[in-house]
């Protein structure tokens, strides 16, 4: 595949750069198509992405419909067919600015001003379209073989919500049609697994703009799953000596100034509220409250480690473009805990947290994950607590512990919490990009800020170390992960309805009611479908919509024999005695079988 660089020389593309060049060129061709259809278009940035490309554009008052996006793609295909040569050129700063002024490219001009040290700028041109770019690109527009415009959304200029909201138009591009077809098949699978779609079908949760974007509400079925997850992780934690607490969802601004969140995390927080001369804010995380619980009384080294846990509601101001059902919202509940320990206990506490993470993953059959040691960017003094000695000590300590424990990990710069390094466990869901599910963070910073102490063996006061950790992450995100992994087919212990009783006709309704009552008495979550519908319809609804683990299809034969016909998710049918079936289901519930 031939590509052209900004100095004009043409060469074969390195294989690992092919897709990037294809997608970057696709962004330029899309921009050219937009400019032809909307001459007022003023372009911002248009990079290649992991699967495709996008361009942020100011269209003035113009709003785009799905039909408009289709027309842009149609125009792109015309440009490809025109087989326009793509040529680079370089201009000194003054001429480059003049060119952009003539073309009314206001965002490019502002970007050039940000690049104050640059004395010249490179451009690429195809036909009438010119874009400021360092390249490289395909040599002709016809070399773009397989692409598709996928969606539009909003994006702030320079990702700053104080700036103007632009229209972001996304697309995908691949080497050939076969790769595009494979991607579209993957997207169809993603749509079928999407937790928002399944959540709506199963009645798990809902959202409403009147309540607010990013503020999901759990319905009875969804809250049942949520409570089961809460019970599961609390049992695990209690067995390890965790002490569970409950703290308020708000705190004073001064609390977050003390912790450092106000300086380093304010852009992710909701605005402060003024009440009776004091400023309060919805909490974005729970560590300040837990620090205050520790500070509530004196501690001896004998009290440590002290493990404070909470299923805690938190609030973060996520931009509207990043919101995604219960996977990412502005309100969520963290499976949070803070472990206060001595320096000598760091290794054993990190080991215990890691063991709990991996034990939990085994319980849920989570196998596709990787461990990341997230470190600070030393050059970013604004984002991180400014104490080089503390950071070096904390990062080396966590690195050494993970190495000693034999945990394979990669390191990523700039991903630490503002107060300390962390181990992130990133999962690869059934569809989409990986994200962090579990975390364990080492903190020497907040205990000092809150003047936390314990009396050591020698009678002197010392500052404890704190481990911030979340095993399920947020229950909301973990539930979204499970929905997409299982397509809503939860294991029996987790299913909102574990058994659905389906009378074949009104003649067996009385027997069905008696069986339902017996299952309820056994502690099984059961629903009776007494609608006057054909049995085939009832089975499809239970299997495809409710996704129940077991259906009891009860006809005259079962009523006469006093047994049940059991139909599982695979469609396999077995006749069982009632007590035998109850024993089977209750065993699955008790053992939390998958």
Predicted regions, residues:
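Conserved P-loop NTP-binding catalytic core
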Residues: 45
């Amino acid at each position: 595949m031939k590509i052209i660089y900004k100095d004009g020389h043409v060469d074969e593309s390195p294989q690992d750069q092919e897709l990037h060049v294809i997608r970057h060129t696709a962004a330029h061709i899309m921009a050219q198509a937009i400019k032809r259809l909307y001459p007022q278009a003023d372009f911002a940035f248009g990079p290649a992405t992991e699967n495709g490309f996008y361009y942020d554009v100011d269209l003035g008052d113009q709003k785009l419909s799905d039909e408009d996006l289709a027309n842009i793609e149609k125009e792109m295909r015309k440009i490809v067919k025109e087989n326009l040569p793509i040529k680079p050129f370089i201009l000194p700063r003054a001429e480059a600015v003049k060119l952009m002024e003539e073309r009314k490219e206001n965002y490019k001009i502002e970007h050039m001003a940000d690049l104050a040290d640059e004395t010249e700028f490179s451009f690429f041109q195809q036909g009438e379209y010119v874009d400021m770019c360092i390249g490289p690109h395909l040599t002709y527009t016809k070399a773009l073989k397989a692409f598709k415009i996928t969606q539009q959304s909003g994006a702030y200029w320079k990702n700053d919500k104080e700036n103007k909201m632009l229209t972001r138009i996304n697309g995908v591009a691949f080497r050939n049609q076969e790769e595009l077809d494979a991607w579209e098949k993957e997207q169809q699978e993603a749509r079928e697994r999407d937790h928002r779609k399944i959540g709506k079908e199963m009645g798990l949760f809902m959202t409403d703009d009147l309540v607010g974007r990013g503020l999901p509400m759990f319905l009875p079925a969804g809250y049942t799953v949520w409570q089961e997850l809460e019970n599961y992780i609390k049992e695990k934690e209690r067995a390890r000596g965790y002490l569970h607490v409950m703290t308020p969802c708000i705190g004073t601004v001064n609390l977050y100034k003390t912790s450092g969140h106000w300086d380093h995390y304010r852009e992710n927080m909701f605005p402060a509220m003024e009440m009776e001369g004091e400023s309060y804010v919805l909490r974005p995380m729970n560590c300040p409250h837990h620090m205050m619980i520790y500070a509530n009384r004196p501690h001896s080294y004998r009290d440590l480690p002290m493990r404070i846990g909470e299923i805690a509601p938190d609030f973060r101001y996520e931009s509207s473009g990043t919101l995604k059902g219960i996977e990412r919202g502005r309100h969520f509940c963290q499976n949070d805990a803070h472990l206060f320990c001595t320096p000598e206990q760091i290794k054993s506490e990190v080991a215990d947290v890691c063991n709990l993470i991996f034990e939990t993953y085994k319980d849920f059959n989570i196998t596709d994950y990787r461990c990341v040691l997230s470190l600070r960017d030393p050059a970013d003094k604004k984002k991180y607590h400014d104490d080089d000695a503390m950071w070096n000590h904390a990062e080396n300590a966590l690195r050494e512990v993970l190495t000693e424990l034999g945990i394979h990990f990669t390191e990523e710069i700039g991903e630490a919490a503002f107060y300390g390094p962390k181990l992130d466990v990133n999962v690869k869901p059934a569809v989409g990009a990986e994200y962090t599910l579990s975390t364990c963070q080492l903190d020497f910073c907040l205990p000092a800020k809150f003047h936390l102490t314990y009396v050591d063996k020698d009678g002197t006061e010392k500052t404890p170390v704190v481990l911030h950790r979340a095993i399920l992450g947020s229950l909301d995100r973990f539930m979204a992960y499970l929905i997409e992994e299982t397509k809503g087919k939860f294991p029996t212990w987790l299913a909102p309805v574990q058994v659905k009783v389906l009378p074949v006709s009104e003649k067996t309704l009385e027997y069905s009611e008696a069986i339902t009552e017996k299952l309820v008495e056994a502690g099984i979550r059961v629903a009776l479908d007494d609608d006057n519908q054909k049995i085939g319809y009832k089975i499809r609804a239970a299997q495809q919509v409710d996704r129940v683990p077991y259906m009891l299809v009860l006809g005259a034969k079962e009523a006469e024999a006093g047994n049940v016909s059991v139909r599982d998710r695979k469609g396999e049918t077995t006749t069982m005695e009632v007590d035998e079936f109850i024993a089977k289901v209750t065993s699955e519930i008790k053992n939390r079988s998958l």
